[in-house]
Regions:
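Fe-S-dependent hydro-lyases/dehydratases of central metabolism
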Residues: 17-482
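Glycine-centered signal
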Residues: 4, 15-17
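Compositionally biased low-complexity segments, especially N-terminal hydrophobic helices
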Residues: 1-7
Length: 482
């Protein structure tokens, strides 16, 4: 914390630029391990296990939190008693102990990221006005902003649509993009992924995720963790990275090195066995999982997937399930690191040294998943044999409302009656039109149960129940060919 005074004005900056901070190691857990031909320091959970044997049975997600506390123990934000509380976690107890979690990085999208960069720029102006060095104002945690939310589709259905949309996008957002480009050059620890690269969660999963950080300056290895400014940030849980969505203010605080306070969460274990039947996709699986977890009630809890079924679950499918955590109500839906994680990292062209680091670290920490290993202690356990999953659809209104494909006809016949009734409700229609006219709107002509459509040289009617293919971009399946 530094206070700068100019005349009668004074501003106190906390956590906006690096200062030496004394860290403790009350349990003497800082050890070394080897990855390839390199050696790293790390805070060993196995060393802590010698003093607190219950660490061995902690869920994967709790081990990530525990390592985070060990690494950030300072006697203030993180105390020895905080570490002991998590090391001796009672899986069945109601959460009542607050801890300080410090994410390793922050992921932003452009709508929420631009205000954050504006705030940093304003802090630099304030620092300069008070006679200080504005260059000292930087994010302490790596912040990565992916431009995707401002993308609009003006042209479609043609081979030149992508190039035209990209050109229009750059022209439309020229000032914003120029500002972000300036920010990337001006601030340390701040990177911008340009538009037309992909949806933020896809970019995070396929390019940005380290899974394990190897800090060259401190020679310290530690898990990749994050918070993001989008509810579906949880997609990154599929690759074994703990992270979830937060608001813009929380994200800015994390960028500036401030921990996020949270109660030690309950962890619901979701045991997967078997494998998907021929003709079933990850979408069918995720709709089934979402329905089960919504019925169970997992709000405010972590969900952790485990079991030998993971051996037959590709990482793209894991990411699809993890992405839907907001829909089933959990804070996160995480998968442990295993051989499939490494295979995916190799598939997405991660360096060989990074893959070696991730595998060696996970094994050294007792966080590597293998078939047949003992189950962790969970607050509750649910089970699903994936061979029982059937082709499904979502809706008609909410993604957690699952409909079996075999039941689609009768479900449609039931649901369409309520839609028709709503459409024929004259009183409600009159009230809506009166309200719209009062607010300056003009009521449109009702199309009834059908609407004429002209596409290129063809003309036809769309009716209730027509089957159409819509160009809907869904982040849930972005990184999944299924």
């Amino acid at each position: 914390m530094v206070a700068i005074t100019a005349g009668n004005a004074s501003v106190r900056f906390t956590g906006f630029f690096s200062e030496s901070k004394s860290m403790s190691d009350s349990f003497n857990t800082r050890k070394q391990f080897t990855a390839g031909d390199r050696s790293f320091d790390f805070f060993s959970l196995k060393a802590l296990e010698e003093q607190h044997p219950s660490v061995a049975t902690l869920p994967y997600a709790q081990k990530i939190l525990l390592e985070n506390l060990l690494r950030h123990e300072d006697g203030s934000n993180v105390s020895k008693s905080d570490i002991e509380a998590l090391a001796n976690w009672d899986a069945k107890a109601e959460p009542d102990t607050e801890i300080a979690f410090t994410p390793a990085r922050v992921v932003l999208q452009d709508f929420t990221g631009v205000p954050a960069v504006v705030d940093l720029a304003a802090m630099r102006d304030a620092m300069a006005n008070l006679g200080g060095s504005p260059d000292k104002i930087n994010p302490l945690s790596p912040a990565e902003l992916v431009i995707d939310h401002s993308v609009m589709v003006d042209e479609y259905g043609s081979s030149g649509a992508f190039d035209l949309n990209a050109k229009l996008e750059f022209n439309r957002n020229k000032e914003r993009y120029a500002f972000l480009r300036w920010g990337q050059g001006a601030f340390d620890n701040f990177k911008v992924v340009p538009p037309d690269t992909g949806i933020v969660h896809q970019v995070n999963l396929e390019f940005l995720a380290r899974v394990v950080f190897g800090n060259e300056q401190t020679n310290l290895a530690y898990p990749d963790t994050l918070v993001g400014t989008d509810s579906h940030t949880t997609m990154i849980n599929g690759v074994g990275v703990l992270g979830w969505g937060v608001g813009g203010i929380e994200a800015e605080a994390a960028m500036l090195g401030q921990p996020i306070t949270m109660l030690i969460p309950q962890v619901v274990g979701f045991k997967l066995s078997g494998k998907l039947a021929e003709g079933c996709t990850a979408t069918d699986l995720v709709l089934t999982v979402t329905e089960m977890l919504r019925n169970k009630g997992v709000v405010g809890k972590f969900v952790e997937f485990f079991g030998d079924g993971l051996a037959d679950l590709p990482l793209a499918d894991r990411a699809t399930i993890a992405n839907m955590a907001p829909e089933y109500g959990a804070t996160c839906g995480i998968f442990p690191v295993d051989g499939e994680t490494i295979r995916y990292m190799e598939l997405t062209a991660r360096p060989k040294e990074q893959c070696q680091l991730v595998e060696a670290y996970a094994k050294a920490q007792g966080m590597w998943r293998e078939d047949g290993q003992p189950d962790a202690q969970y607050s509750d356990v649910m089970e699903l044999d994936m061979s029982t999953v059937q082709p499904s659809l979502a809706g008609p209104k909410r993604p957690q409302d699952r409909v079996l494909l075999s039941d689609m006809q009768k479900t449609y016949q039931r649901e369409v009656k309520s839609f028709v009734k709503d459409r024929q409700d004259k009183d409600d229609k009159s009230m809506a039109e009166a309200r719209e006219e009062g607010e300056g709107g003009t009521p449109s002509k009702s199309v009834g149960g059908s609407a004429p459509v002209k596409y290129r040289d063809a003309e036809f009617n769309l009716q209730d129940g027509s089957v159409v293919i819509a160009a809907i971009t869904s982040c849930t399946n972005t990184s999944n060919p299924a």
